[in-house]
Structures are given as C-alpha cells and as structure tokens.
Design a protein with these regions (language model features):
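N-terminal, active-site-proximal structural segment of metallo-dependent hydrolase catalytic domains
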Residues: 1-56, 68-73, 135, 230-232
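Active-site neighborhood of phospho(di)ester-bond hydrolases with catalytic His/Asp-centered motifs
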Residues: 33-35, 62-65, 149-153, 172-175
Length: 232
C-alpha cells in the first residue's frame, strides 16, 4: 500500500490521524509506504504522526526526515506488519534550489524470508528533477538483494520520464492487475491524475494478483493498494 497522507489533513481541512489509521486498517495491509508525514511539527500539534499511526494500526514503523520544519521533522515513513530488521535512508541531490527529498528502505522478515520495501516522494514541480531523483533511487537500489518493492508519490504521470525510468527494471503492479483502469489517485475528491505507484522489481518475479483504490477524503490523495504474490 502507498498513501500520501497530507500530514493527516483531509479534504475537509481537518487534521484527523485516527481517520487515516482507519483507512489503513480497513485495507489490512502488510506493508505501507507513507509520504508527507510530520513528526513534532507545529502545524500538526507537535504530534509524532508515525508513532501514533503505528500505535493505531499495531504495526512496526520506520521514519526518515527530509526537512526540518516548524520545530520538527517532515518526511516519509513505512508501516510494517512484519518485523523491521534494518533501514536505510538517502537524500537526493537537487538540480536546482528545491525542497529536499529522499527515500527510506526497510528490510523486513516476511514469513521467514527477507524482503525490501521502499517508499519515496519526488519533486512536484519539475520533470527533470523527478528524473534526476529516480536515477539516484535506482542507483542506490541496484545491489539490494532479495525481493524489492518500491512505492510512493512520484508526482509523475505514466507518460513522464520518472515513470519510464522505473519501468525499465520494475513492473507496475496496478497495470498488471488492472490493465483497463487508469488508476487515478489525485486529488482525492475527484481524481484526475495517476501519480501514486507500487512497483515490483521485474527480476524478482513478483506478481500482482489484484489492485484497488479506496475512495476516501482522509487526505488529498487516495491510497493505492496491491496484493502481491511473492515466490521466495
């Protein structure tokens, strides 16, 4: 599952983390990549959002901050039904003065086997920035062993350069399971864009059995969920 939670603020402009947690719990995911997560930030009442969501979902978690903001941290996070064994966080270099972004990778123990799960959030303004970030992401992951899943808000449509780069070595779980559906995820009240993705490394042989997009106004994005079959 991938979900840009908009720091817990829904389309009604209300901060409501229990609502976000309910959306997650209703899908019963094993792994969740979250983007736009606050930790101790003034605008979200200094709440440690990922710790709170972990408590409400009863999942393990990992957080990586991309920016210091209003006395706290803002970044990406992972929730896992499986035990997290190790994490890795990288910041991307920028082509120009822009918001610092990055990714977090968690190695988890799934049914006795190691699995790597990554979430990222790319530049929303410039396509060349997204492409540059994606190049760095792929380079950082090229030697990761075992099944690899990459999810996130790529801020890129399927005709964009970042998406095309990912498809060079990764399969698109939504396209595999829903070839006749657009998979629109933003904005939440009336989605017109597909920018949130679940990718599986092609060489690993992961198969998307099904994918779905819950309708919810809990954030400005809707989540994207896939059921994956992994042959260890």
């Amino acid at each position: 599952m991938t979900y840009n939670i908009h720091v817990g603020v829904g389309m009604d402009k209300k901060l409501d983390l229990p609502r976000i947690a309910k959306v997650i719990n209703d899908q019963k995911p094993d792994l969740v990549g979250l983007q736009e997560v606050d930790r101790g930030v003034e605008r979200t009442q200094h709440i440690d959002e990922i710790a709170e969501l972990a408590k409400l979902t009863k999942m393990d978690y990992a957080f990586a901050f991309n920016l210091p903001y209003q006395g706290g941290q803002y970044g990406v996070a992972i929730l896992s039904r499986f035990r997290i064994l190790a994490t890795d966080h990288r910041h991307y270099k920028n082509l120009r003065e822009a918001e610092r972004r990055g990714f977090i990778r968690a190695e988890v123990l799934a049914h006795g086997q190691k699995l790597n799960f990554v979430t990222t959030h790319l530049d929303y303004q410039y396509e060349d920035g997204r492409v540059f970030e994606t190049e760095q992401l792929l380079k950082a992951l090229e030697n990761v062993a075992g099944p690899l899943i990459v999810v996130g808000d790529f801020n890129d449509v399927p005709t964009g350069g970042a998406y095309r780069l990912m498809r060079g070595s990764f399969a698109d779980a939504w396209s595999m399971s829903n070839p006749n559906s657009e998979g629109l995820s933003y904005p939440a009240d009336k989605p017109t864009k597909r920018i949130d993705y679940i990718f599986t490394r092609s060489a690993d042989g992961l198969r998307a059995r099904r994918g779905w997009i819950p309708e919810t106004p809990a954030s400005d994005h809707v989540p994207v969920v896939a059921e994956l079959e992994i042959r260890f």
